[in-house]
A protein has these predicted regions:
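Conserved core of the PLP fold type I
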Residues: 74-164, 175-222, 236-245, 273-285, ...
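Conserved glycine-rich beta-strand-loop-beta hairpin in the small C-terminal domain of fold type I
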Residues: 341, 345, 360-370, 377-391, ...
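Hydrophobic residues in well-ordered beta-strands that form the structural core
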Residues: 132, 153, 231, 410-412
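N-terminal small-domain helix-loop-helix segment of the aminotransferase-like
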Residues: 9-111, 118, 335, 347-349, ...
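Conserved core segment of the aminotransferase class I/II
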Residues: 250-252, 269-271, 280-360, 446
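Generic structural signal for small/hydrophobic residues in well-ordered secondary structure
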Residues: 48, 90, 106, 130, ...
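PLP-dependent enzyme catalytic core of the Aspartate aminotransferase-like
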Residues: 92, 100, 188, 401-409, ...
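Intrinsic disorder/low-complexity segments
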Residues: 31-42, 152, 158-178, 246-273
Length: 448
């Protein structure tokens, strides 16, 4: 009766069922202890998997945005690509960061997940293959499966690097020597039916950010194999070093000081697509279409508002055909609501200030983690909201022991398809005092 798109078994795995039971028992124990006198030594529960800024004291000022946007909540002006005013707000978001997109290169979606779905529908047929990073976030496989697509891995490998070549993160020393890199040779094993290469930068969960050399290799691979390049950069605002680049800079050129001198991408440097529609498509740009995915979920910490977007580049001779195809798919759903577009327009004005608040938290927690664990066990994070730690025992046993003995919840590495045992994934969003406490407990377990 059910579609073959769905997994044959929808029940939780035995491990995750046990993890949920253990978590419930720990929470009950902590609740009882909180009500007793003389239990000051009891360890409180700390969630190191938290993924929403709303849960850790980092909300955006939504009330002010609502007042600004309320007048447009009842507006019904359907546009397959999204309201032009909202797309122009996204253009301004990029401009503040040195980007030169135009409104004609922006397509709004109800979420980043929906953006994937639109791209899969536009470019793939059932049975085609998406190349995804390993380790990587498991949602990507699910989204592909729901479109009758298959995933094949390419690899991020842990390498020891020359310390002098690794840029120091803000407020930190450059004494680290382990980091994840893109294994470009692993791309060569791609199946013939591969249609899309998916990069995630900053990567969840390793914190890898795509370098220029890695980018050039990925673009060359897509050009040679007539593939689409998709870059998930939902964590793009949260690079830890000034040396970390947004990958669209490799296509359009970066203007790092644009916040001070403004965007100088004049009309004379744009391509006239007709009808007064000017698009930034460099004549000497890549020969493959490229899409960058992002959204309010991370840009302003508002996953509840459900607004994402894709910014895209294509060779000039293919741009109009691709945009028409994307709008055809979008027009079938028109899933982006008026309130979401109105609020997004208002909130993106404050994205730079929000980015600064969150990045300060992330850097503080990353420093705490690196002081507790050497680079060999805690590889360099170049950006994002997560870090990985290798504690050297079975993932499942380690995760359960941390929860039972130390009341710290982490995610096991196998959930992200690490090819070796002993990895756990932790969020860098948690409140700094709680984060420091949790890291100390992790360290004590590792030393025991």
């Amino acid at each position: 009766m059910l579609s073959s798109r769905l997994p044959k078994d929808l029940s939780p795995s035995p491990f995750f069922a046990e993890l949920e039971r253990t978590k419930a028992a720990v929470l009950a124990e902590c609740a009882v202890a909180d009500g007793r006198v003389g239990n000051a030594g009891r360890l409180p529960f700390i969630d190191m998997t938290v993924s929403s800024p709303l849960r850790v004291g980092l909300p955006v000022d939504l009330d002010a945005a609502v007042e600004d946007a309320r007048k447009d909540f009842g507006c019904w002006n359907p546009d397959a690509a999204g309201w032009k005013s909202a797309r122009e707000a996204v253009v301004e978001y990029y401009r503040e960061r040195g980007g030169n997109f135009t409104a004609g290169q922006i397509i709004l979606t109800a979420s980043t997940s929906e953006a994937y779905s639109v791209l899969f529908k536009t470019f793939c047929d059932p049975g085609d293959v998406i190349l995804t990073p390993m380790p990587g976030y498991p949602l990507l496989d699910t989204l592909a499966q729901l479109e009758h697509l298959e995933c094949a891995p390419y690899f991020l490998s842990l390498k020891r690097e020359n310390k002098k070549k690794i840029p120091a993160c803000a407020g930190m020393t450059s004494g680290v020597d382990f980091r994840f890199i893109l294994d470009t040779d692993s791309l060569l094993a791609a199946p013939e039916k591969a249609k899309i290469l998916l990069l995630v930068s900053p990567h969840n969960p390793t914190g890898h950010c795509i370098s220029r050399e890695e980018w050039n290799a990925a673009v060359r691979f897509c050009e040679e194999n007539d593939m689409i390049l998709v870059v998930d950069e939902v964590f793009g605002d949260y690079g830890f070093s000034p040396e970390v680049r947004r990958s669209w800079e490799y296509v359009f050129g970066g203007k790092r000081d644009s916040r001070l001198r403004g965007n100088d991408c004049g009309r004379e440097s744009l391509w006239d697509a007709g009808g007064g529609d000017f698009i930034n498509l460099p004549e000497d740009g890549p020969k493959c279409p490229i899409f960058w995915l992002n959204g309010l979920s991370k840009a302003v910490g508002s996953p509840q508002l459900k607004l994402g977007w894709m910014a895209f580049y294509a060779p000039r001779e293919r741009f109009e055909e691709i945009r028409a195809a994307l709008e055809f798919v979008e027009d079938a759903y028109l899933s982006v609501s008026a309130p979401a577009q109105a609020l997004g327009t208002a909130l993106l004005k404050h994205s730079a200030a929000y980015e600064s608040r969150v990045k300060g938290r992330l850097l503080q927690n990353w420093q705490t983690l690196r002081e507790a664990f050497p680079s060999k066990y805690c590889p360099e994070v170049l950006g994002g909201w997560y870090a990985v730690v290798r504690l050297g025992e079975d993932d499942e046993e380690l995760t359960l022991r941390l929860l039972k003995e130390k009341h710290v919840l982490v995610q096991p590495g196998f959930f992200f398809d690490f090819d070796e045992d002993g990895w756990v994934v932790i969020s860098l969003l948690q409140e700094p005092a709680l984060f420091k406490d949790a890291v100390a407990r992790m360290r004590s377990l590792a030393d025991s």
